[in-house]
Swiss-Prot record:
Its cofactor is thiamine diphosphate. Its EC number is 4.1.2.-. It comes from the Bacteria. InterPro entries: Phosphoketolase, THDP-binding, Transketo_C/PFOR_II, Xul5P/Fru6P_PKetolase, Xul5P/Fru6P_PKetolase_C, Xul5P/Fru6P_PKetolase_CS, Xul5P/Fru6P_PKetolase_N, Xul5P/Fru6P_PKetolase_ThDP_BS. HAMAP family: Phosphoketolase. This is Probable phosphoketolase. Pfam families: XFP, XFP_C, XFP_N. GO terms for molecular function: aldehyde-lyase activity.
Length: 783
């Protein structure tokens, strides 16, 4: 193999690498004396040493080589760092490119600026140790491992000129999310999408153990990657000069392969799934760091993972650190003012070609609004509340179909789901766009195409990761999922919510489209699949996050769902959670009333309520709880003809919090107008009851709020038996009201006996007939 790098260029690139390594070590260790123009003293070293060295030199090596490729070929490229604990390396490179100073002018390119750069790293109220949102060029923090490759593919979708270089740590490669992410290449269309270059970095060790992929044979690893559909290229060694040449040549080769794949697809109509290139880079963990500390090997071992030299009460350690840092020869890298020398600065790309300044890594800079149809045009027409039944998500599907249709030209919207689009009644979208599929297509297959925009794969991890990558690079999306199984990505949601929370404090981070979840096939209609499919707890999980990030909606019918979905698709920098059923349910509000209701978030349903001061407030949130509440209202009017009832429906769950706690929260006056200050409130809730108590505990009438919801009772049974098992049924709600209205004390015993007799009749009937009682099955509202 002929050398790609001239000797002069090799020396300069090695110097640039040394500069990045020097700045990385400085961030971990130093608070003063950044250029080592004095002998290193103990007071130059931070009192608390935090950070991770082991992965960093490998990340820095790749960065300088990708910069050469960008400059040589004028590439549009971003860099995703799976081992995000190598944060000092990415900060160092953003600083060397000048982007860091542009974003943070106080961190100037000078001796003082370098000192501030060092001091702020992992310092109280400084910058985090990972590739956090504060890091220019980052769309992936990499704190929680496993999501880098899914983010990379999400970024590449519909970005035909973008190359996403994605470093996969060999420890990260052991996670389930990463293992399935290799299959993303079956969903990447080279005719219209960008390219992902996975770079598996085998440095051999995790925190305290070897990595699996570093300890299998080269042939096994080759077979594994080829089995995933990649063509692996190996770069190995511990001699910098040799590795520089090998890596440069390999990058040239894989770029040529990427361009050939894209040319065949774009100019010659080749629709076969290509074998994309990837790189396996095997270099020592903690390369260029100390070989040994206290007689124990460090470089190339797990001991290099975090801070290789830690105890500076030992004077030999101070000497060891100084020798390590001086081995990078900082006087050759920076001038006397602390600025990177001009001949090295010339190696870096400029402007938006810098990976740290690429607008795809600050997706809000590229974000264009969706072309949304008027959701009113898709409304269910009602002659009155409860006049007909409809499948709410099927109605939504017609709206999303035309959202998709309107975005076909702009190519900035995709629908994501784990093999559930049709099951969740959203299959109208398939009328305008099939499902993306680059693998083999057989005669029995329907709605599969290399040109699809509906992304279905049976991995919630991939759906979430793809969508996050798509959103973070300036596009829009929608994720539908069975309610119980969205828990699979609980932790991924956590990380995205944290990312958005941090971004809100960073002025240069432009707002991105919200992450929109539709949870359906929900707990109350999973009677056919049973206990394993019954869990509404994601609502609680989302509610734990910062109020400036999360929104939770429980539309009671199809028209409310349309209004909520339109609102969510227009929003920015939120995680919107929508929970709505897919089964035929009674419809309550015409579209104008639905818009008003969703705008206020909660309100009295006057058509179901009595005028004046109520005896009881019957509150509800969720489609099935709404039906049960209204059925309970009818029962109460039969049982107690002179009863005064107020029906309050909540569609925006966060209005229950005080306005001091959430921007959507009702002020105390408005809350009291709805729920009274002293009357019993029977609250039928879609999820776990204690969440309502958490949200309302500061309210004046909280002591009188009695909540029914899911209490972890379930099985394969009838739809109505599901609510019975959890005391959410209409008969229980009616009894709860009678038991809590003081003037009805003399009716309590009779009401209780009637309730248990009804429950016995219900149990016997479903046991004999396998279906619900006719009065339940055939119930409907009438004023």
């Amino acid at each position: 193999m002929s050398d790609v790098l001239s000797n002069d260029l090799l020396q300069k690139m090695d110097a640039y690498w040394r500069a990045a390594n020097y700045l990385s070590v400085g961030q971990i260790y130093l608070q003063d004396n950044p250029l080592l123009d004095q002998k290193l003293q103990l007071d130059h070293i931070k009192p608390r040493l935090l950070g991770h060295w082991g992965t960093t030199p490998g990340l820095n090596l790749l960065y300088v080589h990708l910069n050469r490729l960008i400059t040589e070929h004028d590439l549009d490229m971003i860099y995703i760092t799976g081992p995000g604990h190598g944060g000092p390396g990415l900060v160092a490179n953003a600083y060397l490119e000048g982007t860091y100073t542009e974003r943070y002018p106080a961190i100037e390119r000078s001796r003082n600026g370098m000192q501030r750069l060092f001091r702020q790293f992992s310092w109280p109220h400084g910058v985090p140790s990972h590739v956090s949102p504060e890091t220019p060029g980052s769309i992936h923090e990499g704190g929680e491992l496993g999501y880098s490759l899914a983010h990379a593919y999400g970024a590449a979708f519909d970005n035909p000129n973008l190359i996403v270089a994605c470093v996969v740590g060999d420890g990260e490669a052991e996670t389930g999310a990463l293992a399935t992410s290799w299959h993303s290449n079956k969903f990447l269309n080279p005719a219209r999408d960008g390219a992902v270059l996975p770079i598996l970095h085998l440095n051999g060790f995790k925190i305290a153990n070897p990595t699996v992929l570093a300890r299998i044979t080269p042939q096994e690893l080759t077979d594994l990657m080829r089995g995933y559909g990649y063509e692996p290229h190996f770069v190995e060694g511990d001699d910098p000069a040799v590795v520089h040449q090998t890596l440069a040549a390999t990058l040239e080769r894989v770029l040529g392969e990427i361009r050939a794949i894209q040319d065949k697809a774009r100019n010659h109509g080749d629709t076969e799934r290509p074998r994309w290139p990837m790189i396996v880079m095997r270099t020592p963990k903690g390369w260029t760091g100390p070989k040994q500390v206290d007689g124990k090997p460090v470089e190339g071992t797990w001991r290099a993972h975090q801070v290789p030299i830690a105890d500076f009460k030992n004077p030999e350690h101070l000497t060891l650190l100084e020798d390590w840092m001086r081995s990078y020869r900082p006087d050759e890298l920076f001038d006397a003012t602390g600025k990177l020398r001009d001949e090295l600065q010339a190696l870096a790309p400029t402007g938006r070609r810098r990976m740290s300044a690429n607008p795809h890594a600050n997706g809000g800079e590229l974000l264009e609004p969706l072309s949304l149809p008027d959701f009113h045009d898709y409304a269910v027409t009602l002659t009155g509340p409860g006049a007909l039944k409809a499948e709410a998500t099927r109605v939504l599907g017609t709206f999303l179909r035309d959202v998709m249709k309107n975005s076909l030209e702009s190519e900035n919207f995709r629908l994501f789901g784990p093999d559930e689009t049709a099951s969740n009644r959203l299959d109208a979208v398939l009328q305008v766009s099939p499902k993306e599929w680059m693998a083999a297509i057989e005669d029995v297959d329907v709605d599969l195409s290399p040109d699809g925009r509906v992304m279905e794969v049976l991995s919630e991890h991939l759906c979430q990761g793809w969508l996050e990558g798509y959103l973070l690079t300036g596009r829009h999306g929608f994720f539908s999922c069975y309610e119980a199984f969205i828990h699979i990505i609980d932790s991924m949601f956590n990380q995205h919510a944290k990312w958005l929370k941090a971004c809100a404090t960073i002025p240069w981070r432009k707002p991105i489209a919200s992450l929109n979840y539709l949870l359906t096939s929900h707990v109350w209609r999973q009677d056919h699949n049973g206990f394993s499919h019954q869990d509404p707890g994601f609502i609680d999980h989302v509610a734990n996050k910062k109020s400036n990030v999360v929104r939770i909606y429980l539309p009671p019918d199809a028209n409310c769902l349309l209004s909520v979905a339109d609102h969510c698709l227009r929003s920015r920098n939120y995680v919107n959670l929508i929970v709505a059923g897919k089964q035929p349910e009674w419809q309550w509000l015409d579209i104008d009333a639905a818009v008003r209701h969703c705008t206020t978030g909660a309100g009295i349903w006057h058509w179901a309520s009595d005028e004046g001061e109520p005896d009881v407030v019957m509150a509800c949130a969720g489609d099935v709880p709404t039906v049960e509440t209204l059925a309970a209202v009818k029962l109460l009017r039969e049982y107690v003809p002179d009863i005064k009832i107020r029906v309050v429906n909540v569609v925006d769950l966060m209005v229950l919090q005080p306005s001091s706690e959430h921007p959507h929260g009702l002020d105390d006056r408005r809350f009291d107008e709805l729920f009274t200050t002293d009357k019993p409130v029977i609250f039928a809730f879609h999820g776990y009851p204690w969440l309502i108590h958490r949200l309302t505990y500061r309210r004046r009438n909280h002591v009188n709020i009695h909540v029914r919801g899911y209490k972890e009772e379930g099985t394969t049974t009838t739809p109505f038996d599901m609510v019975v098992l959890n005391d959410l049924d209409r008969y229980r709600l009616a009894l709860d009201a009678i038991l809590r209205i003081p003037r009805l004390a003399d009716q309590r015993d009779a009401a209780t006996s009637r309730y248990w007799a009804t429950m016995q009749r219900h149990k016997l009937y479903i046991g004999e007939h396998g279906d619900d009682l006719p009065e339940v099955r055939d119930w409907r509202w009438s004023a």
